[in-house]
């Protein structure tokens, strides 16, 4: 939750980022944040589920207001978003992101371009690899992450199939961009991606082996909070 500030208007996309409200609710912090989906709901708690739980993407419990989708996108286009939490399919070394086409499947970007273009902070959330990866949380002391098997497909690539978010343009606009995965967190810089956090019990080689391009390592590289790897609510 360090990436969110009380009072933020936060858009949520599908995928891992859709779990943000559940974490906020677990910690009892939902009051200060205003969650938004492009379907029109603003405020309250989005009724977004997960692959194993029933959800209704676009619906909100106790919304402050419900707008037309056109009005929501006008708000986004005007720079009203503080934070956008989005998924990703492929990431290039300059921070550019593809969500529209991969492995021969053309999905299209949907509202992704509109949402990410002017959000002050963009959080791309997803796994480092795709295709039946297997990781286990180690809840004992010290807590951490055990990587059993990487997915068949790398997602951080030298070349991506489409550019739906342009990294260099984001830097020029002054956007803050983070790429948050299960084992590593990267920050976008003018020189490309910089590794700033790594999961406990994971070494840098386990990150480098899953990424095609070279990235820099922050001199202030730190471990992710061990509490994130325990099956218990994290105290705010």
Task: Name each region found by the language model.
Residues 49-234:
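Conserved phosphate- and dinucleotide-binding cores of soluble alpha/beta proteins
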Residues 1-62:
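N-terminal active-site beta-alpha-beta segment that forms phosphate/nucleotide-binding
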């Amino acid at each position: 939750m360090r990436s969110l500030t009380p009072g933020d208007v936060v858009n949520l996309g599908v995928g891992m980022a859709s779990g943000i409200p559940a974490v906020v609710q677990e910690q009892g912090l939902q009051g200060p944040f205003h969650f938004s989906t492009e379907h029109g709901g603003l405020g309250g708690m989005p009724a977004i589920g997960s692959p194993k739980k029933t959800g209704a993407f676009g619906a909100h419990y106790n919304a402050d207001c419900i707008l037309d989708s056109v009005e929501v996108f006008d708000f986004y286009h005007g720079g009203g978003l503080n934070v956008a939490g989005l998924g990703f399919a492929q990431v290039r070394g300059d921070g550019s992101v593809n969500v529209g086409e991969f492995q021969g499947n053309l999905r299209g970007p949907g509202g992704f371009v509109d949402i990410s273009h002017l959000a002050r902070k963009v959080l791309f959330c997803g796994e480092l690899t795709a295709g039946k990866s297997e990781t286990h949380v180690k809840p004992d002391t010290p807590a951490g992450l055990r990587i059993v098997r990487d997915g068949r497909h790398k997602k951080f690539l030298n070349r991506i199939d489409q550019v739906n978010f342009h990294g260099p343009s984001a830097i020029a606009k002054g956007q803050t961009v983070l790429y948050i995965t299960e084992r590593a967190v990267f920050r976008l810089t003018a020189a490309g991606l910089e590794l700033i956090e790594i999961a406990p019990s994971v070494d840098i080689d386990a990150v480098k082996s899953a990424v095609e391009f070279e990235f820099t390592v922050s001199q202030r590289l730190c471990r992710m909070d061990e509490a994130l790897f325990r099956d218990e609510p994290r105290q705010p």
